[in-house]
Amino acid sequence: MSAIRPAAVVVLAAGEGTRMKSATPKVLHDICGRSLVGHVLAAARELEPENLVVVVGHAREQVTAHLAEIDPAVRTAVQAEQNGTGHAVRMGLEELGGVVDGTVVVVCGDTPLLSGETLRQLAATHTADGNAVTVLTAEVPDATGYGRIVRDGASGAVTAIVEHKDASESQRAVREINSGVFAFDGRLLADALGKVRTDNSQGEEYLTDVLGILREAGHRVGASVAADHREIAGINNRVQLAEARRILNDRLLTRAMLAGVTVVDPATTWIDVTVTFGQDAIVHPGTQLQGTTQLGEGAEVGPNSRLKDTRVGAGARIDNTVAERADVGAQASVGPFAYLRPGTRLGAKAKVGTYVETKNASIGEGTKVPHLSYVGDATIGEYSNIGAASVFVNYDGQDKHHTTVGSHCRTGSDNMFVAPVTVGDGAYTAAGSVITKDVPPGSLAVARGQQRNIEGWVARKRPGSAAAKAAEVASRKPEGED
């Protein structure tokens, strides 16, 4: 184990979070595609700890199930009653056998902006300074309401954490505050937790009392200052949740732009932590990129588009579109106002145009579905053209069925393809056709009734109407006169 690699990280995630006013446990609320506790776990994993323990309590079945999904290797400890942060850490250590040799880092499960880099700095400072405990602190513009860090003027060691209500005027002038994140000597921590008292207004075991116990025993208490005070912000309500989402989104967009991505309007662009970009990708205003979405080199998305778990190939263009679990080939064109549902796969240079919806459809290279169509449960070959207002009728009321259209086909406007049906390579279909039988390669399919004109119908059925009058005037015009 390296000098700064902790023996354990303990994440405190047992609180109810009543100020969120939500049926969802606080630590499971999402920002930028990851739960609050998920962000904390990701930062903690950067330390490569020997053990990672999450202390759960409120809604523990739901939280534990989520943890198993996002990080199966994590261990959980139960704090059945909310008896304070010191008690929660004690439950975490009991999961590890009670005493841990090495450094134990304690973090809060509702601090999604905390970075792995800051935690590494904390662990490194703790080891280098030989501290019994190291407090992660931050200097904030306004420290009102926070516990102040009081240091020894000569050594810089932390002598006390004074709560705002108990602070003197000189102490209230201090802008360095306690984050609630600590690095401890594991053996000293276990011993000190056994000495924490509950004779306070809340009747709880406070983790901060450990600092005083260790200092009074002659051990050094130090501090590591976070470079960005916003990293230590905890989430207690929806306002703070929104602010954290904005900060993290700005961080993600800045990273993308510095890597060669053009974001036209960062204020209206939202991305998840798992989104990736190729160089020279362009993102237009009003765009949301979610989940594992990938934009290839030179791909262009937006404005007003939402993509989730979607791959966009190099040079592809997506405009005013919603796409989920879709795969868009290189130099393909989508939109405006298209909807790519799960299972959509577009080949290179394919086109899905205005007001087109696709689902579980494979559309080949160079094929075009330009207008007002639904393509579901279908395979279309290369360089075919699907006429406007076409519908792939895939559902018979009980089961879904598949339609296959070959390569180099031309289908007329207002076609219905009633699955299961196959249109062979190079075949054409006439406008207005309802295709219910297979069309052989190279054939023209015409599946519509003959047109029948009933002369004088309007005059008989709608006498005196505007249509009847217009028809009467037209009938009096000499042939050939406009």
From Swiss-Prot:
Catalytic activity: alpha-D-glucosamine 1-phosphate + acetyl-CoA = N-acetyl-alpha-D-glucosamine 1-phosphate + CoA + H(+); N-acetyl-alpha-D-glucosamine 1-phosphate + UTP + H(+) = UDP-N-acetyl-alpha-D-glucosamine + diphosphate
Protein name, UniProt field: Bifunctional protein GlmU
Compartment list: Cytoplasm
Enzyme class: transferase
A GO CC annotation given for this chain: cytoplasm
Record text on cofactor binding: Binds 1 Mg(2+) ion per subunit.
Binding site for UDP-N-acetyl-alpha-D-glucosamine: 12-15, 26, 79, 84-85, 147, 163, 178, 236, 341, 359, 374, 385
Major localisation: cytoplasm
Similarity comment text for this entry: In the N-terminal section; belongs to the N-acetylglucosamine-1-phosphate uridyltransferase family.
Protein role: Catalyzes the last two sequential reactions in the de novo biosynthetic pathway for UDP-N-acetylglucosamine (UDP-GlcNAc). The C-terminal domain catalyzes the transfer of acetyl group from acetyl coenzyme A to glucosamine-1-phosphate (GlcN-1-P) to produce N-acetylglucosamine-1-phosphate (GlcNAc-1-P), which is converted into UDP-GlcNAc by the transfer of uridine 5-monophosphate (from uridine 5-triphosphate), a reaction catalyzed by the N-terminal domain.
Superkingdom field: Bacteria
GO molecular function terms noted in the UniProt entry: glucosamine-1-phosphate N-acetyltransferase activity; magnesium ion binding; UDP-N-acetylglucosamine diphosphorylase activity
Cofactor(s) annotated in UniProt: Mg(2+)
Keywords: Acyltransferase, Cell shape, Cell wall biogenesis/degradation, Cytoplasm, Magnesium, Metal-binding, Multifunctional enzyme, Nucleotidyltransferase, Peptidoglycan synthesis, Repeat, Transferase
Database matches in InterPro entries: Bifunctional_GlmU, GlmU-like, GlmU_C_LbH, MobA-like_NTP_Trfase, Nucleotide-diphossugar_trans, Trimer_LpxA-like_sf
Gene3D superfamilies (UniProt xref): Hexapeptide repeat proteins, Spore Coat Polysaccharide Biosynthesis Protein SpsA, Chain A
